[in-house]
């Protein structure tokens, strides 16, 4: 890790020593102490430059400075300079990244040219100062300086440092005094001070001058001001004056480029700009390169030594030429040099040895302030002029969690800059830099536009550099003394002798041969260097163009108009208000555009763009569509459809409630460059419990997703208020009679019963009705429609009545059908309009050309949704700036930086100790679709709160072999006493949504607790309520400055490969083996040999469409040729059935976008009703998508918009149930918000009303738990009556076809189970329909119940498709949140426990007749009873098969119910997949499924023909399910990510595969199931469990507080429309499954106390009737039955005792 350690020197005295070496962990000081203002440890917000340069200068304490005897000087008085006892020689220390230490010489050239580029930038800044001084940014800088002066800003991310005015005055006065002594020929004693880097400059106006550079001030300018800055800093006036350099005498004809072009510096002084100070330029002599992580190496020392000797040799040769200067002066100076970072692109106009241009003996005493700024590098100017220039470098890295942050460029820019503006604010998501908390100024971007000439400045001086190298001999005569005395580097040795010349001459002779070898080597490297420079210059030229094309800088924005920032209040008291919106343009000018509360962000953007264009501000090559608006200073972005009213509301509620709302200030920025900003959605506040949705992932992914949604929304069909009734997809059952009766509700509460034939349509029935009423109430049958009573659906007049699902189900179950006649006008004209639009759409689809995929027989895009999804936006690649990942053959390398907050995350609790012997390590693994591709672990470090690795981990997987969609998982593990503990993990997608491998930014991610999950989420733990561990890492920069992207078109790439077109030869034996593999279930794992065989037979598999999943599992995803060929096969693969395509949504295929697209095209074959069945799994599959903007998400939303009535509610509530799940909350919020944004307004309002109602019921259910049991009913009634916010009309969440009105408080109560659910009753909107009852549950996870009920519904669908109707009663249940949900109440039903208890208490469980007698009581005629027995037989067969296959446990008689029509059904599915309950270590449930003797008795006995029919039905149903075993396995696999306790891994699904017995034929399976039937009947433990349960809950089962028996037949006939009995389906897992102590009333009716008295007589009468019937039955039974009855009585007595 690149740690930043900043040493800031304040008021350093002359006797103080300076630091000369900086390594990665500390500052090493010399012998003498120094005053350190502050030392900062590394910070995650610090952005570390890869190259830091430390320029050092010091003087020699040598008295002998007269070594040039050949010089014709008039007077040479060399005095001793005793400023500092430091013998450090002039040098430059470069702190270089290890990865950049490849070419030392290129780095030296890099440094030289970087300095000149900086000079040119500063000159340009000064020339444009008049223009910049009036800008808002410069004013902000002035305010920043004032804060520095007042010590109100801490040391962090400071970009500009200005010296004190008093020091500048003193310095200027001393310089003026020294300039008066220019004609003296004496060398003056100079008091040298700590100045900054000296910029070389010269002019040719004066030929003879004495150069005296005197500095008498001690000015230490700090790049990072600290609170310890001296208080005598006083800035009175900020004016910049130009400094002209002194002119040096030339004796040669040529001049260097530097001499031709004087450098200009900056000084802040109270003097007038016309006043000038003359200074003398100096150059840098020696350069040493140091690996900053390891200190100086031997190569460094040798290179430094050879450089010094080479320059001394050149100087000696110049001395022999006899070229003399008329004046020789020794100018001593102390330089305070700050760490700078040159760009990695070397300019071409600084070459050769241009460092010996001065004719002065310069002894330098260096005070080093090696301060590495957190943004870039900084250079401070000579003569106490300090200006920190921020630059963005090619290899620059800034901290982020998802992608690199934007950066801003301070007042200057250079062609080497990466071009991205740099934020002054250094804050990240997790850390806020200190200046952010001190001053609001730094929150705004600060980038000044450079001039066009600066950006496109061509370097035309390359050819003149070498010509100037030999023209400086005349200026080098007097430099020999300096070079001979100062060549010893401070890092190598310190000479305290006054005679350095002899030592240096000795070194020259000793290393002469080494120098020659070096020169020869340099000659050979010249060509290579020229190539490198040429390449870099080309890259620089591209970057220059990108500066403008990307919109970072403006092309000479000459417009002077600026609308200003005058604020005005927003009149929020008005419902519709208007205001002016201030928009900041990229050129930093402002425009004002009109807006209102309803104006969208997009409309403001368009107005701002038009206004900016009109005023001449926007001269960009980028189009308007590439820009978006960001909220100024808040890092917040809104979707383009967000109205301004929502923005103001968000500001008041969530940002600054106390601030008075004024003008809205937005900034026009490039959409692609948004990274730190948060995308806030404000249009679904009510849906998200009043909280805005804030996306923290890639904003471009979300914005792209919203754009696609807008296209899909245009295809949505208009929704009618009253949808058509659902048609049954199955043929009419054979059991339906030829004639049936329909009861029609007419006008004014009239009712008419009609006898209909099975071939009647709704219109023919309406015609018959009009004929019967023509004398009393005549009407036109064409102007009326039939509505299903109680359900908001109308019957299409042209369809047969038996094709309507509702009518068929009613005939089968009850035989009672209720319809309501309504006038067509009351339904509105929406129906007619809808029919007309449907006809138009059908005509357009017929005329539209259908796009084929390579073959007419392949899938056709016959849907507008798929046409939209097929428009894949391929990213635009700039070939010069991008490189394919297939060309990078290096291994994936990641640098593990550090991890912190380990203690706060309670990691020691996971380990079980906080022993110091614990060691931590990180496992870095690359996965694709859950398959491990490569892994590598880090070194072990000691356990502490903050752990630093700073280690490169080489993952043994080449970048070229990484598939698109691969993820890297980092797992933090602890080792203690040989055991490994998994502390946390996080997943990171290697290629982003644009296919870019982001290697140019460090990442900091929050860990999820536990072990690495290869198919888990790829977002970090942003929503953690506890402090999560933060881990930081970065990838290696492979091809800087180019970006690595995944190959966009692999198919085209492999098509060019001539060697890849050979077809493999497959033998017949291999084909047979392949067919056997294809028949294996989805849980079958292919071994290596089978994978190779499948891939070899890939074209044979093409003839077997079901082999697709096996083929995709056989692809070697690290081989791009195989991947490309697999994609090519997908293009021509036959279309799979929608059910088979579900397997392709498995997490093991989720990382491949192409597979996802093919699966979606197959799923589009489903009807809306089939899609509703699989909606739960499809929503769960979205969790595994690569990005939000996935084809599956768009497909589902598009299909939902096509049919809101059927799919809208299931889709929304499945999303909302998991919206608080931390791993997927962001994705599901994105989907739900996008879905509702473009959904019809009435649907949005409906969801709001439903959420409001549920919130009221949930809060009431929580409060009622604290109320005593006997007062709960009254408490519930009173609270519901007093509740004023209840919506008056809403749809039922689990069945939106039912519209309900107000709640009925007197019919609501709390149930007496542990979770205290609420029994609530609503009034139906249809006056002819009975009230609707449901159970509102809180504190229970209903997801397992929902999954089981869904699988039961799927089984019923499969059976009906095979013409097998088993009369399944599948009630509806929906989860509305975490631990909350609604359950449908099944009317006219009773639990088996209550029926048995009513037949004799505990002994009733051992009797055979209770259920049969109960059915006879409610079906008085023999015909109706036989119908009830038939329904009981079929439904019992269905549930026997279903409960056995699914392994449903906890099957006692209180979880089995029967309705009065004979339908048996199960409730409470808290245990499945073989998780049966145990007691004292023994399994209580021994039987394969529940089939007790009393059930068999109802069927007709074991020897009856009806029982044989029952057995045959069971076997048939079992074989039908077995033939679709892969569907159930796929559905369970898609549910692995839900977190259901009993469905964690594939091992749980193995139970399901075992129960299917796929190894048997249908005949063998039938025999196998027959054995299970007889085994279940003969298992006595089932009956004993029933008896024990009755005994445990006897009080509730027989008490008056519980539900009564169903009324007599006469009472049922009197109240046909009203249910005589209701049952409570309380599916609490903890109540019914885990607790046997508190289940008193979970599945029964609970009468109020007022009903006890009325029901007492009825109970006694019913008991007498039951006794009489039992007597008759006992008389008619044989001896065995009598014996059984006696045994039952004995068992009852023993149990009672």
Swiss-Prot record:
Region of interest (Disordered), ranges: 57-91, 169-229, 244-279, 310-376, 398-428, 440-504, 1609-1697
Residues annotated as transmembrane: none
Biased composition (Basic and acidic residues): 1626-1681, 1688-1697
Residue ranges, compositional bias (Low complexity): 60-87, 170-196, 212-222, 312-374, 398-408, 457-503, 1609-1625
SUPFAM superfamilies registered for this protein in UniProt: ARM repeat (SSF48371), C2 domain (Calcium/lipid-binding domain, CaLB) (SSF49562), Protein kinase-like (PK-like) (SSF56112), Ubiquitin-like (SSF54236)
GO biological process: bleb assembly; cell migration; cell motility; phosphatidylinositol 3-kinase/protein kinase B signal transduction; phosphatidylinositol-3-phosphate biosynthetic process; phosphatidylinositol-mediated signaling; regulation of chemotaxis; response to bacterium
Record domain PIK helical: where: 1060-1238
Biased composition (Polar residues): 409-428, 444-456
Signal peptide: none
Region (Activation loop): 1466-1492
Domain PI3K/PI4K catalytic span(s) in chain numbering: 1304-1581
Keywords carried by this UniProt record: ATP-binding, Kinase, Nucleotide-binding, Repeat, Transferase
Region of interest: 7 X 2 AA tandem repeats of K-E: 1659-1672
Domain C2 PI3K-type as annotated: residue spans: 888-1036
InterPro entries: ARM-type_fold, C2_domain_sf, Kinase-like_dom_sf, PI3/4_kinase_cat_dom, PI3/4_kinase_cat_sf, PI3/4_kinase_CS, PI3K-type_C2_dom, PI3K_accessory_dom
Residue ranges of Sequence repeats: 1622-1626, 1627-1631, 1632-1636, 1642-1646, 1647-1651
Matching Gene3D superfamilies: 3.10.20.770, C2 domain, Phosphatidylinositol 3-/4-kinase, catalytic domain, Phosphatidylinositol 3-kinase Catalytic Subunit, Chain A, domain 4, Phosphatidylinositol 3-kinase, accessory domain (PIK)
Top-tier EC class: transferase
Source organism, top-level taxon: Eukaryota
GO cellular component: cytoplasm; plasma membrane
Stretches for region Catalytic loop: 1447-1455
GO molecular function: 1-phosphatidylinositol-3-kinase activity; 1-phosphatidylinositol-4-phosphate 3-kinase activity; ATP binding; small GTPase binding
Enzyme Commission (EC) number: 2.7.1.137
Reactions the enzyme catalyzes: a 1,2-diacyl-sn-glycero-3-phospho-(1D-myo-inositol) + ATP = a 1,2-diacyl-sn-glycero-3-phospho-(1D-myo-inositol-3-phosphate) + ADP + H(+)
Family: Belongs to the PI3/PI4-kinase family.
Name recorded for this polypeptide: Phosphatidylinositol 3-kinase 3
């Amino acid at each position: 890790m690149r740690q930043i350690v900043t040493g800031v020197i304040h008021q350093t005295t002359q006797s103080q020593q300076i630091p000369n070496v900086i390594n990665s962990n500390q500052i090493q000081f010399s012998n003498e102490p120094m005053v350190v203002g502050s030392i900062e440890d590394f910070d995650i917000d610090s952005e570390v430059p890869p190259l830091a340069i430390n320029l050092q200068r010091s003087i020699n304490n040598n008295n002998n400075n007269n070594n040039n005897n050949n010089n014709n000087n008039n007077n040479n008085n060399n005095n001793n300079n005793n400023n500092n006892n430091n013998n450090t020689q002039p040098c430059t220390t470069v702190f270089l990244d290890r990865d950049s230490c490849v070419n030392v010489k290129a780095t030296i050239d890099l440094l030289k040219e970087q300095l000149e580029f900086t000079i040119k930038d500063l000159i340009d800044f000064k020339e444009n100062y008049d223009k910049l001084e009036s800008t808002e940014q410069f004013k902000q800088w002035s305010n920043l300086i004032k804060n520095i002066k007042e010590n109100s800003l801490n040391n962090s991310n400071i970009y500009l440092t200005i010296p004190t005015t008093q020091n500048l005055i003193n310095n200027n006065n001393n310089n003026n005094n020294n300039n008066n002594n220019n004609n003296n020929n004496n060398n003056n004693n100079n008091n040298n001070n700590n100045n900054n880097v000296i910029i070389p400059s010269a002019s040719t106006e004066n030929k003879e001058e004495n150069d005296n550079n005197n500095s008498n001030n001690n000015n230490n300018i700090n790049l990072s001001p600290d609170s310890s800055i001296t208080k005598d800093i006083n800035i009175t006036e900020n004016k910049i004056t130009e400094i002209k350099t002194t002119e040096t005498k030339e004796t040669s004809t040529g001049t260097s480029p530097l001499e031709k072009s004087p450098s200009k510096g900056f000084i802040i002084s109270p003097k007038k700009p016309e006043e000038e100070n003359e200074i003398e330029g100096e150059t840098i002599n020696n350069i040493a390169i140091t690996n900053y992580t390891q200190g100086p190496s031997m190569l460094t020392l040798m290179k430094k030594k050879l450089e010094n000797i080479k320059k001394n040799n050149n100087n000696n040769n110049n001395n022999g030429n006899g070229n003399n200067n008329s004046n020789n002066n020794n100018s001593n100076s102390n330089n305070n040099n700050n760490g700078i970072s040159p760009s990695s692109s070397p300019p071409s106009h600084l070459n050769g040895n241009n460092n010996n241009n001065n004719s002065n003996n310069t002894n330098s005493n260096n005070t080093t302030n090696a301060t590495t700024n957190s943004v870039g590098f900084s250079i401070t100017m000579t003569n106490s002029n300090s200006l920190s220039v921020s630059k963005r470098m090619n290899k620059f890295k800034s901290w982020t969690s998802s992608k690199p942050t934007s950066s801003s460029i301070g007042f200057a820019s250079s062609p080497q800059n990466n071009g991205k503006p740099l934020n002054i604010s250094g804050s990240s998501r997790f850390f806020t830099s200190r200046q952010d908390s001190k001053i609001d100024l730094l929150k705004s971007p600060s980038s000044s536009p450079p001039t066009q000439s600066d950006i496109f400045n061509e370097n035309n001086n390359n050819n003149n550099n070498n010509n100037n190298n030999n023209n400086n001999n005349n200026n080098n005569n007097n430099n020999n003394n300096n070079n001979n005395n100062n060549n010893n580097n401070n890092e190598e040795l310190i000479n305290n002798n006054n005679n350095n010349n002899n030592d240096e001459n000795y070194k020259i002779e000793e290393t002469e041969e080494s120098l020659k070898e070096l020169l020869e080597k340099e000659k050979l490297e010249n060509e290579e260097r020229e190539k490198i420079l040429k390449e870099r210059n080309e890259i620089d030229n591209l970057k220059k163009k990108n500066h403008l094309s990307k919109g970072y800088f403006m092309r000479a924005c000459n417009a002077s108009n600026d609308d200003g920032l005058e604020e005005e209040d927003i009149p929020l008291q008005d419902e519709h208000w208007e205001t002016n919106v201030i928009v900041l343009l990229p050129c930093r000018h402002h425009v004002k555009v009109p807006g209102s509360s309803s104006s969208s962000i997009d409309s403001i953007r368009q107005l701002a763009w038009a206004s900016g264009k009109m005023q001449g501000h926007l001269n960009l090559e980028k189009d308007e569509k590439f820009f978006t608006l960001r909220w100024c200073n808040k890092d917040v972005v809104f979707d383009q459809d967000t109205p301004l009213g929502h923005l103001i509301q968000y500001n008041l509620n969530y940002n600054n409630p106390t601030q008075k709302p004024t003008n809205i200030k937005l900034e026009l920025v490039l959409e692609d460059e948004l990274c730190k900003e948060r995308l806030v959605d404000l249009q679904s506040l009510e849906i998200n419990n009043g909280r805005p949705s804030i996306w923290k992932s890639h904003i471009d992914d979300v914005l792209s997703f919203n754009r696609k949604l807008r296209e899909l929304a245009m295809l949505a069909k208009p929704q009618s208020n009253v949808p058509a009734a659902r048609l049954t997809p199955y043929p009419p059952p054979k059991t339906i009679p030829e004639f049936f009766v329909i009861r029609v509700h007419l006008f004014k509460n009239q009712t008419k019963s009609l006898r209909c034939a099975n071939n009647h349509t709704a219109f023919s029935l309406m015609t018959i009705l009009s004929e019967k009423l023509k004398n009393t109430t005549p009407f036109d049958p064409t102007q009326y429609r039939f509505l299903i009573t109680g359900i908001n659906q109308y019957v299409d007049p042209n369809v047969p009545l038996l094709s309507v699902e509702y009518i068929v189900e009613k005939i089968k179950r009850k035989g009672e059908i209720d319809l309501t006649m309504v006038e067509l006008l009351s339904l509105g004209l929406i129906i007619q309009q809808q029919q007309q639009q449907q006809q138009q759409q059908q005509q357009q689809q017929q005329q539209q050309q259908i796009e084929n995929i390579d073959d007419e027989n392949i899938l056709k895009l016959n849907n507008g949704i798929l046409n939209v999804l097929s428009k894949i936006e391929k990213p635009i690649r700039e070939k010069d700036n991008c490189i394919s990942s297939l060309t990078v053959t290096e291994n994936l390398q990641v640098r593990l930086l550090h991890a912190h907050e380990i203690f706060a995350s309670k990691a020691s609790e996971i380990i079980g100790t906080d022993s110091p012997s614990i060691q931590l390590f990180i496992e870095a693994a690359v996965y694709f679709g859950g398959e491990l591709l490569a892994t590598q672990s880090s070194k072990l470090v000691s356990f502490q709160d903050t752990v630093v690795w700073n280690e490169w981990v080489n993952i043994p997987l080449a970048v070229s072999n990484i598939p698109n969609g691969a993820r890297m998982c980092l797992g933090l593990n602890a080792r203690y006493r040989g055991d490994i503990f998994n502390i946390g993990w996080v997943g990171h997608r290697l290629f982003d949504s644009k296919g870019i491998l982001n290697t140019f930014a460090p990442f900091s991610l929050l860990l999820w607790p536990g072990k690495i999950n290869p198919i888990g989420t790829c977002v970090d733990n942003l929503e953690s309520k506890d402090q999560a561990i933060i881990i930081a890492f970065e990838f290696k920069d492979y091809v800087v400055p180019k970006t690595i992207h995944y190959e966009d078109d692999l198919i085209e790439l492999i098509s060019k490969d001539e060697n890849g077109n050979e077809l493999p030869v497959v033998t017949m034996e291999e084909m047979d083996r392949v067919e056997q593999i294809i028949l294996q279930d989805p849980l079958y794992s292919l071994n290596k040999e089978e994978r190779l065989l499948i891939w070899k037979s890939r074209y044979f598999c093409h003839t077997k469409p079901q082999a697709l999943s096996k083929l995709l599992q056989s692809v070697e995803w690290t081989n791009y040729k195989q991947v490309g060929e697999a994609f090519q096969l997908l293009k021509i693969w036959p279309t799979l059935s929608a059910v088979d395509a579900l397997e392709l949504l498995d997490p093991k295929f989720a990382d491949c976008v192409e597979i996802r697209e093919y699966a979606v095209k197959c799923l589009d074959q489903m009807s809306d009703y089939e899609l509703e069945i699989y909606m739960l799994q499809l929503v769960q599959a979205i969790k595994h998508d690569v990005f939000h903007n996935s084809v599956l998400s768009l497909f589902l939303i598009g299909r939902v918009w096509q049919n809101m009535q059927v799919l809208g509610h299931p889709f929304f509530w499945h999303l909302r149930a998991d919206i608080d799940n931390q791993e997927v909350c962001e994705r599901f919020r994105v989907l739900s918000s996008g879905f509702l944004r473009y959904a019809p307004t009435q649907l949005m309002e409906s969801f709001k009303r439903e959420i409001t109602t549920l919130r009221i019921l949930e809060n009431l259910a929580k409060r009622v738990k604290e109320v005593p049991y006997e007062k709960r009913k009254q408490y519930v009634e009173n609270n519901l009556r007093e509740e004023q916010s209840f919506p008056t009309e809403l749809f039922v969440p689990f069945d939106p076809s039912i519209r309900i009105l107000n709640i009925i408080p007197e019919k609501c109560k709390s149930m007496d189970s542990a979770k205290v659910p609420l029994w609530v009753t609503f009034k139906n909107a249809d006056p002819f329909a009975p009230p609707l009852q449901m159970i509102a549950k809180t504190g229970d996870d209903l997801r397992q119940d929902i999954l089981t009920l869904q699988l039961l519904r799927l089984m019923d669908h499969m059976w009906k498709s095979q013409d097998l109707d088993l009369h399944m009663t599948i009630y509806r249940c929906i989860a509305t949140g975490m631990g909350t949900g609604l359950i449908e109440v099944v009317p006219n039903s009773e639990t088996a426990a209550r029926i048995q208890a009513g037949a004799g208490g505990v002994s009733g469980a051992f009797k055979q007749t209770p259920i049969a007698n109960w059915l006879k009581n409610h079906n008085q005629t023999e015909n109706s009873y036989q119908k009830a027995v038939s329904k009981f037989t079929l439904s019992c067969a269905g549930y026997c098969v279903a409960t056995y296959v699914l392994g449903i446990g906890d099957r006692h008689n209180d979880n089995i119910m029967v309705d009065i029509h004979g339908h048996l059904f199960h409730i409470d599915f808290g245990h499945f997949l073989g998780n049966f309950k145990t007691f004292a270590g023994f399994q209580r449930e021994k039987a394969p499924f529940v089939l007790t003797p009393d059930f068999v008795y109802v069927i007709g006995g074991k020897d009856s023909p009806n029982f044989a029919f029952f057995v045959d039905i069971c076997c048939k149903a079992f074989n039908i399910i077995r033939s679709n075993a892969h569907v159930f396995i796929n559905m369970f696999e898609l549910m692995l990510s839900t977190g259901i306790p009993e469905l964690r891994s594939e091992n749980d699904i193995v139970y399901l595969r075992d129960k299917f017995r796929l190894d048997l034929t249908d005949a063998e399976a039938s025999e196998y199931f027959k054995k299970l039937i007889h085994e279940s009947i003969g298992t006595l433990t089932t009956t004993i469990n029933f008896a024990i349960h009755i005994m445990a809950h006897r009080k509730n089962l027989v008490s008056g507080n519980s539900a009564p028996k169903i009324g007599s037949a006469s009472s049922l006939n009197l109240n046909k429309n009203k249910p005589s009995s209701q049952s409570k389906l309380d599916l609490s897992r903890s109540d019914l499954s885990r607790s046997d102590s508190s289940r008193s009333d979970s599945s029964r009716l609970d009468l109020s106390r007022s009903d006890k008295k009325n029901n007492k007589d009825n109970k006694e009468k019913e008991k007498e009737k039951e006794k009489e019937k039992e007597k008759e039955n006992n008389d008619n039974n044989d001896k065995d039955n009598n014996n059984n009855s006696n045994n039952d009585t004995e068992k009852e007595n023993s149990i009672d005792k």
